[in-house]
Amino acid sequence: MNAAYIVTRFAVPERLHGAESGFAIRPLSVAEVVAIEDQFHGQGDERRIPAGSVAFILPDVLADPSGIPDLITIVEFACSIVAVTGHPSFLAVGIFSQGACRQVRHIPRSTSDSPDISFIKGLTASGMLQWLRRCLQAQRSLKDRMHITANRFVRFAKSESIADAIMDLCISLESLLDHQTEVSFRFSICLARVTGARGDEAETTAALLSDLYDARSKLAHGDPSASRLLRKLEPRVPQLNALAKEIITTYVLFLSDHTRDEWKAHIHKSLYS
């Protein structure tokens, strides 16, 4: 069976190094580095993998090259959700089968690349590996919809434009809902309930989500008043970021063990509990 080795550019804390159920986060061996570099050489690319580079190793992946970008996105998304500062960046992907590297792909640098990232306090190797597994399970269950959730959240996290960031974050969160619920009121109320918030906290959360959706709607329709709402939202982007991470984490954990229809029923039930 194939395994994907996604090589990082950022320093992964040693407390997150480990292996569980075929998943691993660890430094590449000398033999693995040579195998990846040889595969690049075979493609006419004299690329070097720095000594000590760490890889996220994902088991049971398909060998189809068209699926590699989705693997990169889901790992970048998984890291972004549990990151406190910085944004994860990756150097290369190697697909290994029976100990041999069969495919490689270089990952270009981004302006948002961060050499150092801090992760949430208390996160362990086991916790990170289980989170990666859950993200991949949700991806298999949701297919294209999970790609929208992950891709748009990553774009939000990397965006240098407040307008683009707000649009991408809102689309990421919209993908959690059924198309019939994508109106401002239901968007804010449904997602606020996903957090388990009650009373004043739920009201405050719903108001913030409503402002997010209103900004997205105004931007999409070219409303001149969008700039005023963006100025209002800009200082609250860190709060929106934390809230979105909480909502999306709940979504991924639920969908890794349930169907999309069960998720819709769960949201509906939460409105009356």
What are these regions (language model features)?
Residues 1-164, 233, 241, 246-272:
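Charged, non-catalytic interaction/linker regions at domain boundaries
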Residues 145, 161-165, 184, 201-205, ...:
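Residue-level recognition of alpha-helical structural elements
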Residues 146-149, 162-169, 173, 205, ...:
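Short runs of predominantly hydrophobic/aromatic residues within well-ordered alpha helices
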Residues 153-157, 197-199, 225-230:
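Glycine- and acidic
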Residues 167-203:
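Flexible secondary-structure boundary motifs
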Residues 181, 214-224, 249-257:
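Charged/polar positions within long, soluble alpha-helices
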Residues 191-195, 214, 256, 260-262:
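Extended catalytic cores and adjacent scaffolds of nucleotide/polyanion-binding enzymes
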Residues 203-231:
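Histidine-centered, metal-coordinating catalytic motifs and their short helical/loop contexts
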